Amino acid sequence: MIYLRTSDKGNYRIFQHVVKTVPILHSAISSSDNVVRIKTGSGKTGSVSDVKYDGITLTNIAKYGIVIEQDYENGSPTGVPTSGVPITDVTINKVTGTAKSSGTNVYILCASCKNWTWTNNKATGGKKSDKCKGVPTGASC
């Protein structure tokens, strides 16, 4: 599991206020909470760009197959995205597989997300979110 995060707390593999040029390719994730995840801190500044998820298979995911949020504060989501850390030039391609029925297939909560490439993705088995906001052109929730 690889998380991209641009806020101040947490134990993640990539921890910077500027995250750029990150390829996550040809992976299989099973029995995890989340698979494709980018989260940024509420009210923070920085950027996330040129991130590529390609050929990711998910199985038995408890919370989210794909989750991208711009609303984290003190380790929890606020539900209100902020735009200080734009998420741009993201490619999510061939992310396929299943979430648990109690999980959510895709959740996107953005205030400043653009220039995404979203192709051949099919996360199934979980719920469809009705709380997505700011979904970039071409992506789907």
Specify the residue positions occupied by each region the protein language model found.
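Extracellular/periplasmic carbohydrate-active domains that bind, remodel
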Residues: M1-C141
